[in-house]
Amino acid sequence: MMKKMKWALVLALGLTGLNAFGQETPEVKIEKLKDNLYVYTTYNTFNGTKYAANAVYLVTSKGVVVIDSPWGEEKFKNFTDEIYKRHGKKVIMNIATHSHDDRAGGLEYFKSLGAKTYSTKMTDSILAKDNKPRAQYTFDNNKSFKVGKDEFQVYYPGKGHTADHVVVWFPKDKVLVGGCIIKSGDSKDLGFLGEAYVNDWTQSVHNIQKKFPNVQYVVAGHDDWKDQTAIQHTLDLISEYQQKQKASN
């Protein structure tokens, strides 16, 4: 059982080069990024060290749209309670950007609140195979959403950290939620590669750059999301990994 728990946590981390956080870190940290867009960071412990996972939520006239979920089900209620306390609105939509627990782990909880839950068909097939809770609604790789007056776009750039991850683009704010395909600026390596497609990863990042050339903020999936060198640093890490692999062969 312990081996399974540790393996699941490694999957969720998506990287081994994360920096540790002190014990004073809150269960859920919320920071305003733009007018109605907030970054939330949650923490989990692996081998006695605390790590961070980042995602966002959008406050609309209709309610709150949550991208991904807090990392650990014990944080779900506190998170949604805090949203209601801050904004006086309920969560009406949840979108999982890939199948790992720090992204799709809240699908069942958000559904229980009456929120509509979404994932790509690819993510849904992985969740079904793993016998995990699935989204109510699925879509092909790319989809545009409009909630009230707010619009955002889900885009599949190709394989990288996993086969199924997508990014989310908020055009009004020029914010890209990169998730785990984008490594933070201080990541030391590509991390967990058990489900990765390293040879496809560079092209997938280039696809993101081509699709969204005017990014003002990029939110990496883990660690320091405020470091805006994340996209280039991801490309550098991929190149370093490939060079090491080539040298060892």
From Swiss-Prot:
A Pfam short name: Lactamase_B
InterPro entries xref list: Beta-lactamase_class-B_CS, Metallo-B-lactamas, NDM-1-like, RibonucZ/Hydroxyglut_hydro
The protein's enzyme class: hydrolase
Assembly, per entry: Monomer.
Family according to the record: Belongs to the metallo-beta-lactamase superfamily. Class-B beta-lactamase family.
EC numbers: 3.5.2.6
Name assigned to this protein: Metallo-beta-lactamase type 2
Keyword Glycoprotein: no
